[in-house]
Amino acid sequence: MNRKDLGELIIDIHKRKPSYGYHRIWKIIVEETGWVISANLVHKVCKILNIKSKAKHYKYKKPGEESVKYENIIGYNWNTSRPFEKVVSDTTSFWFKKKKSDWTFYLDVFNNEIVGSDVRETMYGNGILNHKKAVENMLNNKIKRGYKDQETIVHTDQGIIYSSVSFNNIFNSYKVTRSMSRAGTPTDNPVIESKNGWIKKEMYIDFDINNYNTVQEFINDIIWDNNNYRPSYALKYKTPIEYRTQLGFN
């Protein structure tokens, strides 16, 4: 391996994943080639080639007042020791072939893995069926992977659906405890806010949305990419599934 070969590979990965910074590019190079190189060398070559991530960090708003709907039992403690210990959720809206869609997804705090999801025509974040299918998908995955009898904290904002009695009744037959951010306080749920911000940018930077026939195919690729391909800084540049399987978890 010489710097010319390295530079060509960096350019190729940058074309595929324009949002990736040098750490993620380094991880992909190591995974795809087996080369023993440092992230610092990749950083130097990126600087020479003037290659930079096209994504920017997500900014948070200031905290608001305390909510009375569900107590924020997580507080600032986002530490976890296993999958499905703490799960967060949000809905993001985006345009697909001139139609707006709502994507509700559930993220496992343990390894940033998307463990539940549903996408359909927009109801401006208030689609009852969209939320119902997404949470059922998450709960089914929890059972399928062997965590049925393990307690799960599901943390969300105070959106209309997340606060509704009918939505929360879904959890009655499961070992789930609800937790909510304070009203108007995205900093109470930094994990999902950060992921949502990155996903919204990466879905347009790293994916050619016009190449997909359906919005479901598009979302399926984003989920696969997040869980199986995208190295995560918080996981020491391992992918979510790589991280949990190496620790021996289903």
Predicted segments, located by residue:
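Basic, flexible linker segments flanking DNA-binding modules
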Residues: 1-82, 185, 239-247
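Conserved, non-catalytic sequence blocks in retroelement Pol enzymes and Pol-derived host proteins
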Residues: 18-19, 34, 79, 157-158, ...
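RNase H-like two-metal-ion nuclease catalytic core shared by retroviral integrases
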Residues: 63-65, 156-158, 164-165, 178-201, ...
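An active-site-proximal beta-strand-loop segment
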Residues: 76, 80-126
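Short small-residue beta-strand/loop micro-motif enriched in glycine and branched aliphatics
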Residues: 113-117, 178-181, 205-206
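Active-site beta-loop-alpha junctions of metal-dependent nucleic acid enzymes
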Residues: 118-148
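C-terminal domain-tail junction helix/linker
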Residues: 168, 172-176, 198-250
